[in-house]
Amino acid sequence: MAENSLLEDSFIQYKCSEYTVGEYYNKINAHSDIGRYTTIIKAINPNIYTPINISLESTIQRLSNEKLPKISDKEGRTNLALQLTKHYGFLYLPKHIESFNHDIELNQHVSLLPLTEEMLRPYEGESVGQWIKLVETIQYAFNRINIPDFTKSMRSAEVFFHDEQIQLYLNEVNPVYDFDKETISLKCDSIASAIMLYIVSNKRRLKSCEVCSKLFYAKRSNAQYC
């Protein structure tokens, strides 16, 4: 059971049926031809998706023990990000769907507000780096919580940017009040923010297995093995 009473143990994700990955040229802005090529994962049909209920604890267990390919192994990192997208879906598709539904509802109440092409545009996909960054941050957070001296051998700049990334994920968590039910809940923009909130809220349950050294969430305070 989560320590934070507002915390959820699962997260609703949305999965498309097929995904593809490729190099795309991203312009800095619409008024300039300057940009760079980025490896992006896209859905074959982004307008068709299925909601799935993801267990946060089992997802965190998997990602915390995922072996990340080296930075120089671009193909390995691309394949891992594609594999994770196929299994869990896009990180920020829920936020896109929420924004789209909000625009539709707003349009129903404000007839003067037209539905623009930007509002109706399907989700354009995500860079490979987004999943890789999440896995890196999860593993850093686990070690930072479980190993007291973990950051002593790290450069201060490295610690700063990892801590900053954790905070960026947590900044995507917002309290929401339901006036009809008179209840308050924590709403996460993405599975990334839901995962990070779960990690920091359950840090006292985090243990290191005495046999394989893998980190796991203990059901009992005296648990020693995963």
Predicted regions and their residues:
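Short helix-coil boundary/hinge micro-motifs
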Residues: M1-L215
